[in-house]
Amino acid sequence: MTKEKIIVIVGPTAVGKTALGIALAGAFNGEIISGDSQQVYRHLDIGTAKASAREQALAVHHLIDIREVTESYSAFDFVQDAKRAIEDIVSRGKLPIIVGGTGLYLQSLLEGYHLGGDLDQKELLAYRQQLETLTDTELYQLLASKGIHLDQVNRRRAIRSLELNQFARDLENQEAPYNPLIIGLTDEREVIYERINKRVDLMMASGLLEEARWLFEQYPAVQASRGIGYKELFPYFQGQASLEEATATLKQQTRRFAKRQLTWFRNRMAVRFDSISESSYPQAIYDRVERFLKEP
């Protein structure tokens, strides 16, 4: 069976994924699927770096503004929503382009797991999320306790082995459901950090403080409020930090988040990274996509 070709753009926050996605959508008759756990929420526009109205007018976007802030959203929900969006886009002869930095969501969509028995996929993904909280050392200690030996140290294989061990009768490891071209964007760490600092300043100038205050006053305990971009400003509203201190914390936490994102994609997904500072960018990516789409 022919697998549907999809483009997946990943990388740390503020590296330019949205701009590349829109450019590729225009060049290759594509539509964008957001792969970001926070952009699903309505009213949270600035802190989630959601594509602006102007950007959304340049390319159709899916999985943006599909939940109220009071609702929860999980990897399971994303997989179901993304599959429907891909089917819809392909049915109209267009190219699905997934753009986002929520690694667990993207990995869950691209993995070739098939639930063959009575196991509910929510149970599988809940177990996966539990494993993701473990350090590498804890993960390999768990493998050893179950008598599982891996020849190579690979976190992704370790988690897959534990899932298969846990759900041996209900989980079949089949081929991945899609044929993805995964594009990773990166740059020197200092460059990424400077982009993050500038973007936070721009967000603050664009009304992030008011957006965060609304969330703090109306829904301080919901899942959406735990995302980076909001909770760092809550101490300011509580009188526990100055605005300067809260903004500095937001920048720091966003930089740390970007570092974790890079580590995730390098260790757990087969990502080829392109530096956005290279003279060949983005033409090299256009050429790669063109070759990919021409392949049988």
Curated annotation (Swiss-Prot):
Residues covered by region (Interaction with substrate tRNA): 36-39
Positions with a binding annotation for substrate: 13-18
Enzyme Commission number(s) of this protein: 2.5.1.75
Keyword entries, A-Z: ATP-binding, Magnesium, Nucleotide-binding, Transferase, tRNA processing
Record InterPro entries: Dimethylallyltransferase, IPT, P-loop_NTPase
Site (Interaction with substrate tRNA) location in chain: 102, 128
Binding site for ATP: 11-18
Catalytic activities: adenosine(37) in tRNA + dimethylallyl diphosphate = N(6)-dimethylallyladenosine(37) in tRNA + diphosphate
GO MF annotations in UniProt: ATP binding; tRNA dimethylallyltransferase activity
Biological-process GO terms, alphabetical: tRNA modification
Named cofactor requirement(s): Mg(2+)
Quaternary structure, from the entry: Monomer.
Protein family membership: Belongs to the IPP transferase family.
Function text: Catalyzes the transfer of a dimethylallyl group onto the adenine at position 37 in tRNAs that read codons beginning with uridine, leading to the formation of N6-(dimethylallyl)adenosine (i(6)A).
Listed name of the protein: tRNA dimethylallyltransferase
